[in-house]
Amino acid sequence: NIVLTQPESAVKKPGESHKLSCTVSGFDVNGHHMNWVKQVPGEGLEWLLSYRKTYNTYYASGIQGRITFSTESSTTFIEIPNLRVEDTAMYYCARGTGFPQWGYWGSGTFLTVTSVTQ
């Protein structure tokens, strides 16, 4: 049974960093194409990166050098430093090739970046 598990939400302040996680079960993350996308409320999906251990990690041009991708055991991560309000979005991990027709998706983490104290 293939499952991609993501935390439901996170709240951060501008200038902070955050590491988003995606823990998988039922397959080896290093043997498949793993992807991250974001969706700003009211907008479409935006591809961020694709990874496979035997290939390079490919980043969207707009975020190349800004976010960092890593893996540890059965979990993939993206770390976003110096967060901005415009980073507020739903972030999804997914397995497969041919964006956006990927076969397996995480449920997404909604990241809120706000200066308002929660």
From Swiss-Prot:
Expressed mainly in lymphoid tissues including spleen, epigonal organ and circulating lymphocytes. Keywords: Adaptive immunity, Disulfide bond, Immunity, Immunoglobulin. One of its GO terms (biological process) is adaptive immune response. Residues 1-109 form the Ig-like domain. Disulfide bonds join C22-C93. Coiled coil: none annotated. It comes from the Eukaryota. PROSITE patterns: IG_LIKE (PS50835). One of its GO terms (cellular component) is immunoglobulin complex. This is IgW heavy chain V region W26. It comes from Heterodontus francisci.
